[in-house]
Each structure stands twice: as C-alpha cells, then as structure tokens.
Amino acid sequence: MKLDAPVMQEEELVERIRVLLPSITEHAAQAEQERKPVDSVMKSLEDAGVYKFFVPKRYGGYEFGLETFMDIGVMLGESCLSTAWVTTFCMEHNWLLSLYNREAQDDIFGKQPYIIAPGALAPKGTATPVDGGYRISGRWEWATGVMHADWVMVGALTPTEDPKKPDLCMYLIPRDEVNVIDTWHVAGMVGTGSNDIEVEDVFVPGHRKQSIVDMRDGSSPGALFHDSPIYKMPMMPVLGLTAAAPAVGGARQAVALFRERLQERSVYGTADKQSQRAMAQARLGHAQVAVETAEVALKNIARTVVHWGESGKPCPEIERAHLRLKIAHVVREARDVVRDVVEASGSHAHFLTSPLQRTLRDMHTLSAHTVFDLDVGGELYGRLLLGLPANAPV
C-alpha cells in the first residue's frame, strides 16, 4: 500500500509515529545544539505521513480527528518537546489552510499533498491592495517550523471600507519569498528554531488571504466547503490544544525520568535509595496522578471542541474564552509537575547531560506562550461572565 494512500487509518499513523519515538528521543539533545529540529527526524515524520493528518480527503489527505491529534502531540512531547512543538504546529497549519476559501485550497492542495508552514499570525505586517491581490511587508516573531518550511502564514492588518477598522487577515506566502532572521537564542524550546521572518513588498494573490475573524467561531469558508465537522471547530481552542498536547507529554516524560532517578539515587550519608523513602514515594505518586489528570482534562477539552464542530453552530465567544482558560490551566499543571519532580531529583538533574533540566527549561518557555497566559485568560473569561465586552481576541 502506498504511504499516502487515503485509506490510512488513525491507528496506523499513530503506530508509525510510535516506532519513531526512540529516534526522536535520541536526537533531542542534537536538536537543542542545532537550534532546530534534526533534519533526519523531521524527514522520518514527514515520510510517516503526519502532515496529511488534517488535509481534507478530497485532496488525498486523511481528515483525521482532534482526539487522536492530542494522542500524537502527547507522544511526541514525551520524546522531545521542541520536535513535538514544531510537528504539531505544522500538522495543525494544514487544518488552518483547510479553513480557507476553495480557490486557495485548490491552488495549494491541488498541487502538493500538504504544506509545512509556520503560522506567525500577529498583525505585524501591512497589506496594500493592488490589482489581483495585495503587497505584503512586515517582520514576524515566533515562526515555528520555518527551518523546514515550504510556505509561511503571516498576519497583517488589511484595509476595509472603514479606514478605522482594518481586518486582521492571514496570508500564505511561498517560503522562498521570505527572509529568515537568526534570532532564536533562548533558554528553552531551543530546538524549535522559531526564528523571525521578514517579507518586503511581496505580492500575494487575493485568494491566498483569509480573515482570521471569520475563522474564530467555526464558520470559515472551509467550514462551508467541507462536509467534515473537523473544519467547523473554533480556531483558537484548536490552536491552544495544539500547543498544550506536547506540554502534557513533557510532563509525562519528566515523571518517568523521576521514577528512574529515585531508583538510582542514594540518600546522602546512608546506604538507602531515594525510592525507599516515604517522601519520595509520595512525590512520585502525586506527580503521576497530576500528569494523568492533566491528560484527562486535555482530552475532555478536545471532546468539547469536537462537539462544537459537530453541532453545526458557531462557538460562542464566552465558550471560546472558557476553553482558552481551561487549556491554560492544563499547561500550568503540566509545568508544575515538571518543576516539582526536578526539585526532588537532586543536583544531578541540572547537569546539561540530563534530559530533566532540558524539559524544565522547555516547559517554562513553552508555558509563557500568549495563549497560556492565565492572567489574560482569566480576566477575559471573567469579563464575559459578568456581561462585559471581551478585551482580547478569542
């Protein structure tokens, strides 16, 4: 059977990825050294078919579901957080393209089976209307996936009939028309290679523009074009879950490493192993339950998002804010699990050869992502509960 045969089953793709996990784990330190995912690892994931996960069946994709996507994100995060982050983002960005108008999808999916693209959607660009499209200029941070990309997605404020109310739109630009600026010198998630990107007066045809506002509640052009409910899910919760799944995997990895560490580490001044001490046993038990609870919460949130896609109704703003805050709490819990087990693992956990210290740095960096900001998310949801207008996009 061909690798890209449309009869691929979700379980088969999951198993293909599972086979790659030892290699992904083995190359995690190299990804950090190179400040980007390792080329051979990314090629193996691409060959396994991961980027066709969300591509519509009409274009030869798999059109798989969100819950299995969560399983994959957790699995990958348990092996290498940086590689997981890039892979899940680039998988999900094929879902974003599937929300575009039909002409854009025919243009791109009609010529290639999937895209590998960062999504730098902050409104850091300008869009100037011209015949047939727009001239785009700007510079964007956080271009996760750009080191292996063939396209980029960027956000730009776009003029409307009301000059005081520009529209925030997403534009698709070929990678070879983009400059990559080496800015990714960070404490954690070093292996993502999420450098800045810049474009200068690049022409983008009109059909490769999509209003982000029209994608937020699940009523995008793609939602009307495709029959599957996965393209009717609200955008921001899907983006949040995309980033949260690797975090839960990172916490699972940390707990597993902590368990191994307890069986090796001696209590200073005694012949006892740390695993024989009640306090260490209790910490392990609490950490295991905490990460299991976070994973259950992650899957429950995903089911709620799927429900909104299946309902055929736009997801209300207050529900999107609620989901955003719940996702942020999952990530905070996962981060705290890692922090707690590293604290109990002794000084050896902080050697650069220890994967625990890398996971700790990665989790602190990952949890600083704007979608996981508990203060902003809490205020936003609280305002809506009180009948006040939202003060942040959701």
Feature names for model-found ranges:
Residues 25, 29-32, 293-329, 339-350:
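C-terminal helix-coil-helix/basic helical segment that borders enzyme active sites and/or dimer interfaces
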Residues 9-12, 16, 33-37, 189-191, ...:
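Short, contiguous, pocket-lining structural segments
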Residues 194-291:
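Glycine-rich beta->alpha junctions and the first turn(s) of the following alpha-helix
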Residues 345-394:
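Glycine-rich phosphate/cofactor-binding loops in nucleotide/flavin-utilizing enzymes
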Residues 37-47, 52-149, 164:
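Glycine-rich flavin
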Residues 139-178, 182-183:
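DPxDG-like acidic metal-binding loop motif
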Residues 249, 285-292, 328-335, 361-364, ...:
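Generic structural signal for well-ordered, non-transmembrane alpha-helical segments
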Residues 1-15, 19, 392-394:
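Basic/polar N-terminal segments that are highly enriched at the extreme N-terminus
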